[in-house]
Regions:
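Asp-based phosphoryl-transfer active-site loop
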Residues: 8-25, 47, 102
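Short alpha-helical
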Residues: 26, 54-55, 166-167
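Conserved acidic, metal-coordinating active-site core of Asp-based
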Residues: 105, 109-185
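Short beta->alpha junction loops/turns
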Residues: 24, 95, 164-165
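Solvent-exposed alpha-helices and their adjacent loops that cap or buttress functional pockets
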Residues: 2-4, 64-65, 151-153
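Active-site phosphate-binding/coordination module
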Residues: 29-130
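Non-catalytic pre-domain segments flanking phosphatase-related domains
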Residues: 1-14, 40
Length: 185
């Protein structure tokens, strides 16, 4: 048994959407003040999200994570960055050969596919309401490319498929069968 006053936390990990941020995707003044206070006390703040790293940077800047040595855990944990040193602490990327397969399957199921560079969202097969929302939430411009697999010639941490829920669920089931444990679907 322990009392509240005897607990010693050294690190706080926060999900972004609906936890750290409100419905407007903003950090409230009260939350910001509390997080600044704990950082001043030497605690470390980690921002954790499925968002891409560039989509989290503005929140990290607002909380001054670079000053206090906080971290960004992005792409559902596939990349971890020390904000103070800019060191990439962990980086798991998709196998390059999986990009073509994912693109082909997205086309087969009639759903969108996107990935991320350091500065933009890259669309593989057209705009839809879901990838428009992804761009808005992450505050990133969108670049639509003709040949998605060919364009993605650099390491990526995540591809996201977008579309109507029924189609996504069907694709998810088939992709899990296809990739097994090789990819997190």
């Amino acid at each position: 048994f322990t009392t509240k006053s005897s607990l010693r936390y050294l690190l706080i990990v926060l999900d972004l959407d609906g936890t750290l941020t409100n419905s407007k995707k903003e950090i409230t003044p009260k939350t910001k003040a509390a997080l600044m206070k704990i950082q001043e006390e030497g605690k470390i703040v980690v921002l954790a999200s499925g968002r891409p790293t560039p989509g989290i940077l503005h929140l990290a800047d607002e909380l001054e994570l670079q000053k206090y040595g906080g971290y960004i855990l992005s792409y559902n944990g596939a990349k971890i960055i020390n904000c103070k040193t800019k060191e990439i602490v962990y980086n798991k990327t998709l196998p390059q050969e999986s990009i073509q397969v994912l693109y082909d399957k997205a086309k087969e199921f009639g759903i969108g596919i996107l990935s991320y560079s350091e500065s933009e969202i890259i669309l593989g097969n057209g705009q839809d309401q879901y990838n428009e929302l992804e761009a808005k939430i992450n505050r990133l411009p969108v670049k639509e490319v003709e040949n998605f697999p060919e364009y993605i010639d650099f390491p990526v941490n995540k591809c996201l498929m977008t579309g109507e829920p029924e189609k996504i669920l069907k694709a998810q089931e088939k992709l899990r069968e296809l990739f097994g444990e090789k990819l997190n679907i």
